[in-house]
């Protein structure tokens, strides 16, 4: 094994074994601090884009509520609730903080060996109105990229939606990967990205 091969292996093996770790997308500043106590509470998932979703999935998914409950050990217990017809679907998981501000790994304890590792990064937030969240997961030889737009209420500014679109573009997501909101005729402010 030559020195270049060894260097390549050293640099890529952690990502191959551990999944992808979010890096700060172009046009977004690295968080220098993250205030978990301000982030906790109820959020509405107002925007969702995912590279595995297609236009035909839109009728199946729509805005939903997510609750971030801060535990004593700085982990978040996350509970999601979505209505589907006359039924309410709920699912929960734990987010474990990493050493980077606003970055977490999703706890897969109990999921068994080989469970998918998911890295989640709060890219941007003001804590009171909106948050942009990037999730990267390696599953069955497929990289899954998800971008979420969270709001404290159902109203969101045009600038925030533009920032959401900018973040999806940095992740090579297209309008076909946007599940909601419907942005078919949206005109992006070119000064935002």
Curated annotation (Swiss-Prot):
<keyword id="KW-0325">Glycoprotein</keyword>
<comment type="subunit">
    <text>Monomer.</text>
</comment>
<dbReference type="Pfam" id="PF00061">
    <property type="entry name" value="Lipocalin"/>
</dbReference>
<dbReference type="InterPro" id="IPR000566">
    <property type="entry name" value="Lipocln_cytosolic_FA-bd_dom"/>
</dbReference>
<dbReference type="InterPro" id="IPR002345">
    <property type="entry name" value="Lipocalin"/>
</dbReference>
<keyword id="KW-0813">Transport</keyword>
<dbReference type="InterPro" id="IPR012674">
    <property type="entry name" value="Calycin"/>
</dbReference>
<feature type="disulfide bond">
    <location>
        <begin position="88"/>
        <end position="193"/>
    </location>
</feature>
<feature type="signal peptide">
    <location>
        <begin position="1"/>
        <end position="19"/>
    </location>
</feature>
<comment type="function">
    <text>Binds all-trans retinoic acid and may act as a retinoid carrier protein within the epididymis. May play a role in male fertility.</text>
</comment>
<feature type="glycosylation site" description="N-linked (GlcNAc...) asparagine">
    <location>
        <position position="143"/>
    </location>
</feature>
<dbReference type="GO" id="GO:0005615">
    <property type="term" value="C:extracellular space"/>
</dbReference>
<keyword id="KW-1015">Disulfide bond</keyword>
<keyword id="KW-0732">Signal</keyword>
<protein>
    <recommendedName>
        <fullName>Epididymal-specific lipocalin-12</fullName>
    </recommendedName>
</protein>
<comment type="similarity">
    <text>Belongs to the calycin superfamily. Lipocalin family.</text>
</comment>
<dbReference type="GO" id="GO:0001972">
    <property type="term" value="F:retinoic acid binding"/>
</dbReference>
<keyword id="KW-0964">Secreted</keyword>
<feature type="glycosylation site" description="N-linked (GlcNAc...) asparagine">
    <location>
        <position position="172"/>
    </location>
</feature>
<dbReference type="InterPro" id="IPR003087">
    <property type="entry name" value="LCN2/LCN12"/>
</dbReference>
């Amino acid at each position: 094994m030559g020195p270049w091969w060894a260097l390549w292996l050293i640099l890529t093996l952690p990502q191959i074994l551990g999944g992808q770790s979010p890096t700060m997308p172009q046009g977004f500043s690295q968080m220098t601090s993250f205030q978990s106590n301000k982030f906790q509470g109820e959020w509405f998932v107002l925007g969702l884009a995912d590279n595995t979703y297609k236009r035909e999935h839109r009728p199946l998914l729509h805005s939903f509520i997510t609750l971030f409950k801060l535990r004593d050990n700085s982990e978040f217990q996350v509970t999601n609730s979505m209505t589907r017809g006359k039924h309410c679907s709920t699912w929960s998981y734990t987010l474990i903080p990493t050493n980077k501000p606003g970055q977490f790994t999703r706890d897969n304890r109990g999921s068994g060996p080989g469970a998918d590792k998911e890295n989640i990064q709060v890219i941007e937030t003001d804590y009171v109105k909106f948050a942009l969240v990037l999730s990267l997961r390696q599953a069955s030889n497929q990289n899954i990229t998800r971008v979420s737009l969270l709001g404290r209420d159902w109203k969101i500014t045009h600038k925030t939606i533009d920032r959401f679109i900018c973040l999806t573009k940095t992740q090579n997501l297209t309008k076909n990967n946007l599940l909601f909101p419907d942005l078919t005729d949206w005109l992006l402010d070119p000064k935002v990205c």
